[in-house]
């Protein structure tokens, strides 16, 4: 019986944990779960056979390597920066490796050793990246097999609130790592538009948004991800005139978030040490010019040209115009902002999250241009069984299960962009209700 080791048991791992806990009950595997804190899993998994909970600081190399050495296959749901170390351990001990995170240069450097040892390493098999790759490649390969040419490909994804839980003006709460949300978009975004390279620096990013619509849900803002260009080779679209990968937020979010960007409140490059009783209002005012005759609100309106009422309402709801003491007074501006947002954007136990993803293709056929819009909407159940956890964890769990059943017989370093991987995974995802709806317009 194979021993599966899961490293990391955070919010995004709940469906994956349930999946393999069920397999362990059927004596299909031994399932070890290692995390800095496993106490939250004890009430859920207590008395279930075939499951072992292991308190582990994954930064402790000796302890981590010992556990990996005694397993057969490793699934990493750790922060992405730890994957190269875990992957190195897996290569050293001859263990297969699976993750939902982006494949790094450090991971690619291990490719010769992975291949020489006959191991299977699969990365980018979650939601974004993951389901986005698989669903897009299915359409891309079908078009190529017909001799059609893909002229434009845009893909957007967002982790948001279900409509019934949108109880604040931002229509947003944290459904994944808050720090990643606060720092999102820093750097320069690159994509292709009608054969031209487009560069979007951070200070313009949240002003350069596309309108993306979903049937029954309305309109969203889509802003470009940092790197769309590298996916030309991943998708076999090296000469495509237009390619863009982006992130979705509810309409109006980006305009309001841009206020924080323009003021410098998302800067993570330096540390502040503010007086102990500094308020939200004083924190905001620190980023505004001095003017004895004007209020914080007036100075903000002067500094931000398109500071409209919906944007004002969003900042007001967060408490930035009130004398509320800051939860933390030491840290970078981004860290202090994050602490404020965590108090306002925390998911409540009754909240439901939502995943939205949309691919937009323009394909040249022998008869003209065919436009395909392929959309996915997934609503979470509750605080533990979120749409994010479902769409991140299930593709990874299914891939591991297919590998254990020898329905995946590949070796080497892979992404789920080939039919041997994406066809069976997408088919299994449909059995869990994760499926895309397509509209096709031909002209």
Kindly give the residue locations of the regions a language model identified.
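ADP-ribose/adenylate-binding Rossmann-like module
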Residues: 89-107
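Helix N-cap at the beta1-alpha1 junction of Rossmann-like dinucleotide-binding domains, i.e.
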Residues: 36-40, 104
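Oxidoreductase and adenylate-handling cofactor-binding alpha/beta cores
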Residues: 132-150
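Rossmann-fold NAD(P)-binding glycine/threonine-rich loop
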Residues: 101-123
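C-terminal catalytic/substrate-binding lobe primarily of soluble NAD(P)-dependent oxidoreductases
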Residues: 145-443
């Amino acid at each position: 019986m194979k021993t599966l080791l899961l490293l990391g048991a955070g919010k995004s791992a709940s469906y994956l944990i349930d999946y393999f806990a069920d397999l362990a009950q059927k004596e299909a595997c031994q399932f070890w779960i290692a995390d800095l804190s496993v106490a939250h899993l004890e009430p859920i998994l207590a008395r279930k056979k075939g499951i072992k909970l292991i308190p582990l600081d994954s930064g402790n190399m000796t302890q981590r390597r010992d556990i990996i050495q005694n397993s057969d296959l490793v699934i990493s749901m750790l922060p992405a920066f730890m994957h190269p170390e875990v992957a190195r351990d897996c290569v050293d001990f001859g263990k297969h490796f699976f993750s939902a995170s982006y494949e790094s240069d450090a991971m690619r450097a291990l490719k010769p050793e992975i291949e020489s040892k006959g191991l299977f390493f699969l990365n980018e098999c979650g939601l974004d990246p993951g389901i986005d790759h698989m669903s897009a490649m299915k359409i891309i390969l079908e078009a190529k097999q017909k001799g059609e040419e893909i002229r434009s490909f845009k893909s957007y994804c967002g982790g948001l609130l279900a409509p019934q839980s949108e109880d604040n003006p931002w229509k947003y709460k944290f459904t994944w790592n808050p720090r990643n949300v606060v720092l999102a978009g820093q750097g320069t975004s690159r994509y292709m538009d009608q054969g031209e390279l487009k560069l979007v620096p951070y200070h313009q990013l949240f002003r350069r948004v596309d309108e993306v619509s979903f049937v029954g849900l309305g309109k969203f803002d889509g802003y470009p991800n940092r790197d769309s260009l590298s996916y030309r080779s991943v998708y076999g679209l090296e000469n495509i005139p237009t390619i863009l990968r982006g992130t979705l937020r509810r309409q109006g979010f980006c305009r309001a978030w841009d206020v924080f960007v323009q003021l410098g409140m998302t800067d993570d490059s330096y540390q502040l040490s503010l007086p102990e009783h500094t308020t939200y209002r004083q924190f905001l005012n620190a980023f505004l010019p001095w003017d004895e005759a004007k209020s914080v609100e007036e100075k903000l309106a002067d500094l931000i040209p398109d500071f409209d009422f919906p944007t004002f309402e969003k900042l007001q709801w967060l408490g930035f115009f009130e004398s509320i003491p800051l939860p933390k007074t030491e840290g970078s501006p981004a860290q202090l902002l994050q602490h404020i947002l965590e108090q306002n954007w925390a998911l409540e136990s009754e909240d439901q999250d939502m995943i939205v993803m949309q691919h937009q293709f323009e394909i040249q056929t022998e008869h003209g241009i065919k436009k395909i819009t392929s959309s996915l909407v997934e609503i979470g159940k509750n605080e533990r069984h979120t749409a994010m956890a479902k769409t991140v964890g299930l593709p990874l769990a299914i891939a591991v299960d297919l590998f254990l059943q020898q329905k995946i017989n590949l070796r080497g370093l892979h992404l789920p962009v080939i039919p041997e991987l994406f066809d069976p995974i997408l088919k299994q995802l449909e059995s869990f209700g994760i499926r895309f709806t397509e509209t096709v317009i031909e002209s």
